[in-house]
Amino acid sequence: KVNSGEYKLMGLAPYGKPIFENKIKNNLIDIKEDGSFRLNQDYFNYATGLTMTNNKFNNLFGQKPRNSKNEKITQFHMDIAASIQKVTEEIMLKFARSLKKEYKLNNLCLAGGVALNCVANGKILKEKIFEKIWVQPASGDAGGSLGAALAYLYDEKNYKRKISTNDDMQGSYLGPKYSQDEIIKQLEDLGADFDILEDDELLNRTVEDLNNGKAVGWFQGRMEFG
């Protein structure tokens, strides 16, 4: 789902093979050496319609986008995810190299949805293009408030910039936090089956589930900003 499920594509990618990489690059996207790109709008519908892609896109890959309500994830979807992830990594690496070449900077700041692609960020970090990489965590519209505030502070109020080598952001966990009683009530209202475990037993069961190849969701503390 657009603007909410992109992280699932990154998570699904390791289970597939990038067999559609060339098809994507030959038909859907023109990538320049500096990382800039142009999408072939013949395959997309978001600029003029209510869907992201069109029938020509479906015919290119031989399938329509998956209906999450009644269609299971198949190897095809895993391979599509792996292919898109690889193309995304290529673009981000080219962007990073061209920025370094043009501006000769030691540090890189990233923001936005794609900036939360930690696999691609890891590739940039591993290549040592920059000494340090900092990612602003609020990737959606909420993050724009930070830029608006800083623009007003520096451009309108002529506030003097203070350059610091340290990360002054003390954390992104600025959202609500739920108590044990609130969590229990919510689970009861939903009719969910649940156990309340002591810390040691909880950790042991979590490790056991992970060793058995199960997926574990961990809910704790405050929600992240953005």
Segments from the language model and where they lie:
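Short acidic/glycine-rich loops and adjacent helix/strand connectors
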Residues: 1-226
